[in-house]
Structure formats: structure tokens, C-alpha cells
Amino acid sequence: LGAYNVGPLSGIYCATKHAVKAISETLAQEVKAFGIHVTDVKPGFMKTEFFGSSHKTTAPEGSPYKHLYDENMKFYMGQNGNQAGDPKKAAKLYIKVAEMDAPYESLPMGTDCCDGIRDICEGTVKLMEKMRSVAETTNF
């Protein structure tokens, strides 16, 4: 979901997700003629320790970003153990897709991922409709 959604203090994480998405889509176009398929996997929140022990950090004392850090940590800790995604089912789906003759180009995993991407895309469409008249002022 980080390839579509960004948040405070997650710039580098989300940038890597954007990069994987762009590289996957580009690579898929480049190798299609060779019969090679590329699938961009987008896992939603899986019930792992991603929001648990891997997030046991603290904000530096006096950091002007401490409030953002605290908000993020509250979110992460609220998610920990409550993720809807089953990593074992995700692993089985990875294998199933890898064995397909024509695998999916994009593989969102989990309803949270599908719903999140849909909501973000709908927001982008609304923004483009709103900004259309401004954008066209740069046309010849």
C-alpha cells in the first residue's frame, strides 16, 4: 500500500514501494516479448511482527517530530496482532500466481489493500477533476 499512500515519517519506506511498483511495471513491458511475466505484489497488513518488535524504537528527545512519531507508533501498536492478512495464505497465493501461465500483473493481497488503493485512486480522480481547469491553462 505504501506505493500509493504516504504518511509522515514514512517517506523512505514509501519511496521504495513506489520504486518497486515503477520497476515492476517497466520490467513487465520490457520482457513481455520474451514471454516473461512480472507481478507487482502489494501485500496488505499481514499478521506478522512488522508492527511489533520491529517497531520498538523511540523518538529522539526534543525532536520536533515527536508528536508525529507518537501518532505513528499508536497506529502501529493498534495494528499489531489485528492485521487481517494471513501470511501463510499469502505464501500459497504467491506460489499459485508463480505457477500461472499468465499471472496477474498486479497482485493486491487483502481487502485492506484493495480498499486502500481504490480509495486513493478515487481521491486522485476527484483531484484531477478539480484541477482540470488549472491544468489546461498551460496548454497552447
Where are these regions (language model features)?
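C-terminal beta-strand-loop-alpha-helix "lid" module of Rossmann-like NAD(P)-dependent dehydrogenases
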Residues: I36-Q79
